[in-house]
């Protein structure tokens, strides 16, 4: 036992690791609150499972989309903290992007150097950092087809609202690869306990709503391949950012987690405060590939630096061609271009038609609407970037 829970002197007293008790987590999980689920196909090991077809029918109208988003947000906040969408991406798109990721991995291996991993032994598995930008530069048309996905956008809007920022990191757990230790994710999931204790209590509650974690299965993932382990409802534990470091909590997670097999093209989204860890791949011949999505609120900042102007310039011809063919590429624009107007230089970049100046995404959408050339878009983006510089 780590220590006794002591009542805080005020509602804003700092949380302390010494006050973390497994008993408190166990009691919370024994009496979970569960939202009313209207659109699920099934519930598996406490986790709502939505079918892509069911969701697409439900979000065909603005009212329907808002209703679904409200349900997904409640699942993430007050429910189990996680949901699965089966068949979220088409296999053809997945296979093309998987091939691109394999090429990137091969190229980066040839360059040498160690690739770190936050929660697993470095070098055991394969990682692609900033996979979003690397995919856009190497395979712009595949990027557009992948990130034009309406269900990735649905999950992102449900938790974060509009203007979200997408980053991605590819994780390949090789045969025999050992899984991760239990953790929470960005932001406070990436600070030491000593630093985490310095953040006020309300920031512990704020951190999870700044980010949505997701993963796209790029291959079939039966349990023996080590799909991610989760502890449903653990995102509600107030001391969780301090607790997951503690041995007793790690042991509790090992004994009580759930593990959902996934099929290629399935997507899982979860609250970043949910206790979770990638599993061990006990197979001898399956390289388990997942594209890990980290979607950030426009009110926060993403973990990775991403050259979004470079991405947009690279994929713009593909955006034009897909638009001309009648495809909706707005979600791909949202995943690539900066969708938030601030910070900016308000002496130069002043609001014209509203409370804020146009965003980079606005520039791209306007260019697409006009059928502007790549060169014209480049000039507009340069002017826009110059206005935003102090």
How should each PLM-predicted stretch be described?
Residues 1-78, 332-343, 347, 351-390:
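Fe(II)/2-oxoglutarate
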Residues 154-155, 180-181, 188-252, 257, ...:
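Catalytic core of non-heme Fe(II) oxygenases with the double-stranded beta-helix
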Residues 91-93, 174-176, 222-224, 237-238, ...:
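Flexible loop/turn segments at secondary-structure boundaries
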Residues 243-318:
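Catalytic core of Fe(II)/2-oxoglutarate
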Residues 295-346, 384-388:
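Charged, cofactor-coupling segments
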Residues 170, 214-216, 291, 295:
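A structural signal for short, well-ordered beta-strand segments
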Residues 96, 227, 241-242, 280-282, ...:
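Short conserved micro-motifs at the rims of enzyme active sites and ligand-binding pockets
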